[in-house]
């Protein structure tokens, strides 16, 4: 009969000891942080108390910590846990890691600690009163304290209740007030001065969304693929084989920024709203989008005019502004994973409501010079394979009459010249590419490669002549985003004929119509663990825009 010691030896022989203890230290650091800032949930209070009580502060080396009927064996040694370390912090964090890592995935052994949730509370009874900041007593000092959690669980962490039944979804505020729609939520957040921390996109009234559902835990190849660049860690898992993605430089944003690309004035309008930029008539930035903007920081369909967010020169209060979404960056929890077909893809770790912003498509902006004839292939150079451009999208500029005059109130044409994402290469190709350093390749070489790819991009569409003519006479050249060597998590998004994401052109760092940000939004509710996909040939956009894809 196998003894407990034998079981323990087998357990530790099958896991990464350093990785497990790194995760455990992050759990302890997170608990310490929430306790010090009075943002801990009831469950976290109990967890922290049991850890300290059961460890007996180094009087025994191995103790059992009870967590929800599960026994977790924790080895506590003197240099790792002492009264001084508990008082001053566990250990200094690596400077290259952001504070968002404190809330990162805690792996297999500590997964039930990372997914802490408040115990179900008794029904809240409402007593008539005028709401104030005292109605949300457990509100953290800053929204950053909620990073790393499921965004839709943020109200629950602040002791709200979400009641879902056949009649719909109702939120119960800590003071007992019922909130049955987004307008009531926004009014309550403004009344209680909590809108700076709990914004409207943290609430969901969709009955298809379960805020407690999350993807099953899996061994992590890397806790944060962005290595601290993203506000929320991007996990990397592979349960199929031992492969890792091709080496690339993670970029949180596109490069160069719009301020370095545009030769025109950066911003055509600015606003100084005091109402959160919710009025399309009074907010100049929302009016620039022809009055169609976010609905409580969500976007459910594509806006052909592009979407103009409030910029750095606007006088509106950023924490209250409802017209700043994309510029906040990644907020949802994503996971890059290996598919059974040995391809890389991305899935959401939590349920997502329709219209949720996911991330932008980051990469390096390159330019295709327009010329009458294509550059010839150099002798001795391999031809560019179609596989090197796995997914390309080009948006045709809407035709305009010669009498049309461009004003500040008019909206620029939607223009996404080319989006290029990396393709899966053969093992031999990967070995060849790994011999070259990313930093050693100059911008001239990249542009040269882009020029060689240009004929293949254009020839896949029958509208090549008219499209090229339009672009040549409207802009100096065609620009495209290259994420083959530098990009973000969006480079792993896959194509689907039935996508759950759509693309929206958003202007944040410039109003130049040539340089929008390419943002991804959910087009319907998405369950936790679902692969995130997008398409350049979906039916709805085909009705309004001419596009072509090359696969």
Swiss-Prot record:
Keywords recorded for this protein, A-Z: Cell cycle, Cell division, Chromatin regulator, Chromosome, Developmental protein, Metal-binding, Methyltransferase, Mitosis, Nucleus, S-adenosyl-L-methionine, Transferase, Zinc
Protein residues bound to Zn(2+) 2: 271, 285, 310, 314
Binding residue positions for Zn(2+) 3: 277, 310, 316, 321
Alphabetical GO biological process terms: cell division; chromosome segregation; convergent extension involved in gastrulation; determination of left/right symmetry; heart looping; heterochromatin organization; left/right axis specification; methylation
SUPFAM superfamilies with a match to the protein in the record: DNA-binding domain (SSF54171), SET domain (SSF82199)
Major subcellular site: nucleus
Binding site for S-adenosyl-L-methionine: 342-344, 491, 494-495
Region (Disordered): 426-447
Residues annotated as binding Zn(2+) 1: 271, 273, 277, 283
Residue intervals of the Pre-SET domain: 269-329
Domain called MBD: residue spans: 146-210
Reported phenotype of the disruption mutant: Randomization of left-right asymmetry, including heart and visceral organs.
Subcellular location: Nucleus; Chromosome
Domain SET: start-end pairs: 332-537
UniProt cross-references to Pfam families, sorted A to Z: MBD, Pre-SET, SET
Catalytic activity: N(6),N(6)-dimethyl-L-lysyl(9)-[histone H3] + S-adenosyl-L-methionine = N(6),N(6),N(6)-trimethyl-L-lysyl(9)-[histone H3] + S-adenosyl-L-homocysteine + H(+)
Recorded domain comment: In the pre-SET domain, Cys residues bind 3 zinc ions that are arranged in a triangular cluster; some of these Cys residues contribute to the binding of two zinc ions within the cluster.
Job of this protein: Histone methyltransferase involved in left-right axis specification in early development and mitosis. Specifically trimethylates 'Lys-9' of histone H3 (H3K9me3). H3K9me3 represents a specific tag for epigenetic transcriptional repression by recruiting HP1 (CBX1, CBX3 and/or CBX5) proteins to methylated histones. Contributes to H3K9me3 in both the interspersed repetitive elements and centromere-associated repeats. Plays a role in chromosome condensation and segregation during mitosis.
Family of this protein: Belongs to the class V-like SAM-binding methyltransferase superfamily.
Record-given protein name: Histone-lysine N-methyltransferase SETDB2
């Amino acid at each position: 009969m196998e003894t407990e010691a034998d079981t323990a030896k087998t357990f530790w022989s099958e896991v990464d000891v350093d990785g497990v203890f790194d995760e455990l230290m992050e759990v302890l650091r997170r608990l310490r942080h929430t306790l010090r800032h009075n943002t801990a949930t009831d469950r976290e209070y109990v967890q922290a108390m049991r850890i300290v009580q059961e460890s007996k502060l180094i009087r025994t080396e191995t103790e059992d910590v009870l967590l929800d009927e599960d026994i977790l064996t924790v080895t506590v040694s003197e240099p790792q846990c002492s009264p001084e370390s508990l008082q001053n912090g566990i250990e200094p964090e690596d400077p290259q890691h952001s504070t968002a890592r404190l809330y990162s995935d805690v792996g297999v052994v500590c997964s039930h600690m990372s997914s802490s949730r408040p115990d179900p509370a008794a029904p809240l009874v409402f007593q008539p009163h005028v709401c104030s900041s005292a109605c949300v007593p457990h509100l953290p000092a800053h929204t950053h304290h909620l990073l790393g959690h499921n965004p839709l669980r943020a109200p629950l962490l602040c002791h709200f209740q979400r009641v879902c039944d056949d009649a719909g979804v109702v939120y119960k505020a800590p003071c007992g007030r019922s909130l049955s729609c987004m307008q009531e939520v926004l009014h309550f957040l403004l009344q209680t001065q909590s809108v700076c921390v709990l914004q409207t996109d943290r609430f969901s009234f969709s009955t298809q969304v379960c805020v407690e559902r999350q993807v099953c835990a899996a061994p992590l190849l890397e806790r944060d693929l962005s290595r601290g660049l993203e506000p929320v860690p991007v996990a990397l898992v592979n349960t199929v084989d031992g492969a890792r993605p091709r080496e690339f430089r993670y970029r949180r944003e596109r490069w160069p920024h719009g301020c370095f690309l545009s030769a025109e004035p950066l911003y055509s309008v600015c606003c100084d709203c005091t109402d959160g930029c919710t009025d399309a008539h009074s907010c100049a930035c929302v009016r620039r989008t022809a009055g169609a903007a976010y609905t409580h920081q969500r976007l459910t369909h594509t806006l052909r005019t592009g979407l103009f967010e409030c910029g750095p020169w606007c006088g509106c209060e950023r924490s209250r502004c409802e017209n700043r979404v994309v510029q906040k960056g990644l907020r949802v929890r994503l996971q890059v994973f290996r598919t059974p077909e040995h391809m890389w893809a991305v899935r959401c770790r939590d349920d997502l409501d329709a219209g949720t912003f996911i991330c932008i498509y980051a990469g390096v902006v390159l330019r295709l010079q327009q010329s009458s004839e294509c550059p010839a292939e150099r002798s001795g150079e391999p031809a560019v394979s179609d596989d090197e451009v796995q997914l390309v999208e080009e948006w045709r500029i809407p035709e305009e009459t010669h009498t049309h005059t461009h004003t500040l109130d008019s909206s620029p044409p939607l223009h996404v010249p080319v989006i290029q994402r990396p393709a899966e290469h053969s093992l031999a190709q990967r070995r060849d590419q790994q011999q070259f350093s990313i930093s050693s390749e100059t911008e001239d070489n990249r542009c040269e490669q882009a020029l060689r790819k240009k004929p293949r991009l254009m020839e896949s569409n029958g509208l090549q002549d008219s499209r090229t003519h339009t672009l040549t006479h409207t802009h100096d050249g065609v620009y495209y985003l290259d994420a083959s060597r530098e990009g973000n998590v969006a480079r792993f998004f896959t194509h689907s004929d039935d996508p759950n994401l759509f693309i929206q052109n958003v202007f944040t760092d410039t109003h130049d119509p040539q340089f929008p940000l390419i943002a991804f939004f959910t087009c319907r509710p998405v369950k936790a663990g679902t692969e995130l996909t997008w398409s350049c040939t979906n039916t709805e956009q085909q009705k309004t825009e001419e596009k072509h894809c090359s696969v």
